[in-house]
């Protein structure tokens, strides 16, 4: 795990190198994805089935076998262990409760001329959600993508989830049932994204695609953007943990919080920032100790070797500068006064405040969404939310008096822009 010191002359260059990561712009990858999209547009269901057999080793002989019925979703939910079912239901309730507070409403007002102006908020008609699949899959991703869409009032939710060798975690199906997903197809990769974006005989064409996936999924989402909306181009998972080395800091807690992201992927990023050199050394030691019996130690070791870092800063102010420069997906402020510190944090996907708020709680059941901007995009992006599944139309309703007054202004400006038909259209309203 590399060590960076903000007081060293090389710090800026080292930090830039640490944050440099891009997989979606690989020319070979993009060419492969473009070819898959073209095949799906041309061949529809038949091509999607063929590619699913090829890439996922799925045993399906017909496309119909790739769709999971509502009956099977209900069976998966009803068959859950009671403890797991209760946990899933609690998570769903909390996610729903949080996102209900995000719902935007239509509004209007009347100006002095009697014109009615406003904004009409409507849900999207159809959305596609991509859920990573296989036996080691993520029911939490189902809840985090589907429930905000449900709260927004989306008409139809179509879920795609890869099932390598035809195997799928029943908990994912149970989560789909609980979240009210309308259709589920066991397909994945760029072919699933293409099918959602352009539609096939069986898969409805959607208006927007959300959810994380591998580099092929990310590249495909970028490629179809414009044909459909997308939530974001998701990169590898990230966490930045900040602590200051006071008596209450538990180095083993901090180390495990870092590893909770490192175990996701060999290119996940775990960064620890502190002004305390003794704490930095303790955390480094605790990481090594924790790796001894961590089931996914090989993945975590590779992640911290590839993209992990321990960063020593001069003080809190400098720590905040580093945080805002990195704009992490997940930020933990493990300090006594996180309320004071958070005011200066401008860029982070989700902020976990205090020592008793591990990122893992946010992944599952705190309530806020765990689909977050990565790769520094928290500088201009937000977590997935209800607002991603709603759109706005401007409302303009002129009174006769208001139209005559505003038409004069429109006429003048249209003439200056040399748009004569615009000017005449406005002029016709003036008595």
Locations of regions flagged by a protein language model:
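N-terminal Rossmann-like NAD(P)+-binding subdomain of aldehyde/semialdehyde dehydrogenases
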Residues: 1-125
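Short acidic-hydrophobic, aromatic-tinged amphipathic segments that line or gate anion-handling sites
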Residues: 2-9, 183-188, 310-315
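Flexible, glycine/charged-enriched surface loops at secondary-structure junctions
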Residues: 104-109, 229, 268-273, 293-304, ...
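Conserved small-residue-rich beta-alpha loop and adjacent elements
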Residues: 109-174
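Conserved NAD(P)+-binding/catalytic subdomain of aldehyde/semialdehyde dehydrogenases
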Residues: 180-269
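Short loop-to-beta-strand entry elements in the cores of soluble alpha/beta enzymes
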Residues: 212, 232-243, 261-284, 300-311, ...
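C-terminal core of ALDH-fold dehydrogenases
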Residues: 325-431
